[in-house]
């Protein structure tokens, strides 16, 4: 069955909450793909053998990941393009020209769409400016972040995604800096012509990684008023502390009660930097059932998982969404 445009679908179904997939990069790592490189989870797509050999091991792994998230209940899924800015790709892979770069993005989107089918929604994932210098978890964009040309950085990926009708939504993920947020919100329909969302990289204390409060973020949006791009569809939090995420989302909801929100936190596991392994967190306070219930009461329309969330987590999220909607 052909899918309705996403905004129309959610408008026609005001109580519907869509289940997002989970942490693709860490899930591919769990399945044996070595993602520890500057282009992160995009790495399997760089090899020509991924495209020329349908029986290649990495191709099978990526297809199985998508399939497992679908079987777990995901209704909206992402392209594996978080670290796929033109700058990152051209500086760290054999792909150099814009033509080669656009071919890579088109291939990834086509492959993702074929994996999930025509009835599910597909997000074109775009990581933050800070991802190419590993600053998405600090928000430290240097002494003069207001002078960074964010548009030139995002332009190649954004222009490609704008033109691709196989995408339903563009997702700016893990945005940690207020100047980057302001830049994205300043772009009109000539720059961002497809529905989009912004996922904020938020400290466990409830502020943007650069220290900006949720109230200050809300004021930026309120000040834009009717100048804001009508394609701005959702605001939310991602790659955030599992325990603190419900309170953070609620603070956004209180500040912007009419804004459609989304949430996809990390699993709650803790990374041991010495042993370089993920460990269960004895301080994990809540279950997915509890967290999802709180997200829904705070206006979330899309709920999923980020780092270390697996198909099992998405299955639990899906069950909770069905229970509370």
UniProtKB/Swiss-Prot annotation:
<dbReference type="GO" id="GO:0061627">
    <property type="term" value="F:S-methylmethionine-homocysteine S-methyltransferase activity"/>
</dbReference>
<dbReference type="InterPro" id="IPR003726">
    <property type="entry name" value="HCY_dom"/>
</dbReference>
<keyword id="KW-0808">Transferase</keyword>
<dbReference type="GO" id="GO:0008898">
    <property type="term" value="F:S-adenosylmethionine-homocysteine S-methyltransferase activity"/>
</dbReference>
<keyword id="KW-0479">Metal-binding</keyword>
<keyword id="KW-0862">Zinc</keyword>
<keyword id="KW-0489">Methyltransferase</keyword>
<dbReference type="InterPro" id="IPR036589">
    <property type="entry name" value="HCY_dom_sf"/>
</dbReference>
<dbReference type="GO" id="GO:0032259">
    <property type="term" value="P:methylation"/>
</dbReference>
<feature type="binding site">
    <location>
        <position position="306"/>
    </location>
    <ligand>
        <name>Zn(2+)</name>
    </ligand>
</feature>
<dbReference type="GO" id="GO:0005737">
    <property type="term" value="C:cytoplasm"/>
</dbReference>
<feature type="domain" description="Hcy-binding">
    <location>
        <begin position="6"/>
        <end position="321"/>
    </location>
</feature>
<keyword id="KW-0949">S-adenosyl-L-methionine</keyword>
<feature type="binding site">
    <location>
        <position position="307"/>
    </location>
    <ligand>
        <name>Zn(2+)</name>
    </ligand>
</feature>
<feature type="binding site">
    <location>
        <position position="239"/>
    </location>
    <ligand>
        <name>Zn(2+)</name>
    </ligand>
</feature>
<keyword id="KW-0028">Amino-acid biosynthesis</keyword>
<feature type="modified residue" description="Phosphothreonine">
    <location>
        <position position="138"/>
    </location>
</feature>
<protein>
    <recommendedName>
        <fullName>Homocysteine S-methyltransferase 2</fullName>
        <ecNumber>2.1.1.10</ecNumber>
    </recommendedName>
</protein>
<keyword id="KW-0486">Methionine biosynthesis</keyword>
<keyword id="KW-0597">Phosphoprotein</keyword>
<dbReference type="GO" id="GO:0005634">
    <property type="term" value="C:nucleus"/>
</dbReference>
<dbReference type="GO" id="GO:0033353">
    <property type="term" value="P:S-adenosylmethionine cycle"/>
</dbReference>
<keyword id="KW-0963">Cytoplasm</keyword>
<dbReference type="GO" id="GO:0050667">
    <property type="term" value="P:homocysteine metabolic process"/>
</dbReference>
<dbReference type="GO" id="GO:0019284">
    <property type="term" value="P:L-methionine salvage from S-adenosylmethionine"/>
</dbReference>
<dbReference type="GO" id="GO:0046872">
    <property type="term" value="F:metal ion binding"/>
</dbReference>
<keyword id="KW-0539">Nucleus</keyword>
<comment type="function">
    <text>Homocysteine S-methyltransferase involved in the conversion of S-adenosylmethionine (AdoMet) to methionine to control the methionine/AdoMet ratio. Also converts S-methylmethionine (SMM) to methionine.</text>
</comment>
<dbReference type="Pfam" id="PF02574">
    <property type="entry name" value="S-methyl_trans"/>
</dbReference>
